[in-house]
Regions:
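A general marker of short, structured functional hotspots
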Residues: 29-32, 70, 116, 120
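Catalytic-site neighborhoods of secreted/periplasmic enzymes
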Residues: 1-67, 78, 97-98, 105, ...
Length: 200
């Protein structure tokens, strides 16, 4: 798959893809990336197993923090060379695996569902979860949503997301919000901020 990283690397940029590649479950390093840190499929929320430049490495901590740490390391190691960092966080995705056949399952030894970093867990515990008027209603006249998926109940009240899950999902991006702040702070400390384009 040709990506914009190939011409950038050819032009002398150090390039890094760090995060959730998720074009299938194959996390093999792709052409054009000087640094490759990816996970198979969805990856794990806690202590993720990563493909770091072709080697399996077990990381420690919440995946958002782990990926941000790799990004900071890459920026620091770039020294005076031009660089391009593509950071793709796993959050807001729930903690589950998607098999090659499309079926899903839980990750052994991992918490299920939406997993915020411990420091953010419970931040919205007392928040009221707003609901649309059609929440939990079967999707009448929407054939694509009425299709049967093996192993899953039809959409409706049985598949409605609980308030607890909504709150946890809202807590997950708090770590993602911190990530660019940490990167911008490092760029400023290294004197690179004014010469760096940041796109979110």
């Amino acid at each position: 798959l040709p990506t914009f990283a190939i011409p950038l690397e050819a032009a002398g940029y150090r390039t890094a893809y760090i995060g959730k590649w998720h074009m299938g479950n194959d996390d093999t390093r792709r052409p054009g990336w000087t640094r490759w840190v990816a996970m198979k499929g969805q990856g794990e929320a806690i202590d993720p197993m990563l493909n770091v430049d072709g080697e399996r490495q077990q990381a420690t901590g919440h995946v958002t923090d782990v990926l941000t740490d790799y990004a900071l390391e890459f920026v620091t190691e770039s020294g005076g060379k031009p660089f391009m960092l593509f950071l793709a966080h796993k959050a807001l995705h729930p903690n589950f695996i998607q098999r090659d056949d499309g079926s899903t399952g839980t990750v052994a030894g991992q918490p299920e569902g939406f997993v915020p970093a411990d420091r953010h867990r419970g931040r919205y515990a007392s928040a009221t979860v707003p609901r649309r008027p059609n929440a939990g209603v079967a999707p009448v006249r929407k054939p694509a949503l009425q299709r049967e998926i093996p192993g899953l109940p039809p959409l409706g009240t049985a598949t409605e997301t609980s308030d607890t899950d909504v709150r946890a999902r809202l807590e997950m991006p708090l770590g993602v919000d911190e990530s660019p702040g940490r990167i911008l702070q490092l760029l400023e400390e290294l004197g690179k901020l004014e010469n760096t384009v940041v796109t979110l």
